[in-house]
C-alpha cells in the first residue's frame, strides 16, 4: 500500500509498532524498553519509536534501546544503525520518503536520538534534538531540514 502512495497512521503503541524495532514490546508490561517482542512492522527502517515522551517523563527511555546496556537486543537488529524517534502527545510525524515533518499542537515535541552523533562523553540530556510543529527531518541524512522563515 505504501509503495502505491497509500498512507498509514498510528498513535501511542500504533506509532511505536511502525518502526523496525519495537520499543516497550514486552508481554509483561510497557515499562520494559527492550522486551521479549522486538520486531516492529518496519515501515520506518532502522528506527525505534517511543511515545508520550514529555507527558510521561520518558525523554531518556529510548537511550535504553539505543545503548542496550543489558545486551538484550536480538542480533538481527543493528543497534548502531537505529535512529530513535520520540513522539509526545498532541503531535505526529508525517513521513514522505526519507523525510518527515511535525504536525499538531504548538506545545508538542518530537525528540530524535542519533547514536551516530554521540561521543563517549556526551551527557544523556544532549543525546537528542528537539523538533516542534513545522520542523522537518531527513531520515537518510539524519539531519534537521532547514525550514525557511514564514512571512509575517
What residue ranges belong to the model's regions?
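Catalytic nucleophile loop
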Residues: 1-21
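C-terminal and late-domain segments of enzyme folds
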Residues: 22-152
Amino acid at each position: 500500500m505504501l509503495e502505491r502512495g497509500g498512507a498509514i497512521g498510528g498513535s501511542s503503541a500504533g506509532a511505536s509498532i511502525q518502526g523496525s524495532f519495537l520499543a516497550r514490546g514486552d508481554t509483561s508490561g510497557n515499562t520494559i524498553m527492550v522486551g521479549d517482542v522486538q520486531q516492529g512492522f518496519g515501515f520506518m527502517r532502522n528506527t525505534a519509536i517511543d511515545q508520550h515522551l514529555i507527558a510521561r517523563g520518558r525523554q531518556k527511555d529510548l537511550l535504553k534501546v539505543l545503548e542496550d546496556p543489558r545486551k538484550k537486543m536480538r542480533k538481527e537488529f543493528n543497534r548502531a544503525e537505529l535512529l530513535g524517534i520520540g513522539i509526545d502527545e498532541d503531535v505526529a510525524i508525517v513521513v514522505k520518503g526519507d523525510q518527515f515533518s511535525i504536525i499538531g499542537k504548538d506545545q508538542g515535541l518530537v525528540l530524535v536520538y542519533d547514536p551516530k552523533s554521540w561521543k563517549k562523553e556526551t551527557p544523556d540530556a544532549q543525546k537528542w534534538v528537539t523538533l516542534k510543529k513545522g520542523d522537518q527531518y531527513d531520515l537518510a541524512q539524519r539531519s534537521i531540514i532547514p525550514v525557511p522563515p514564514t512571512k509575517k
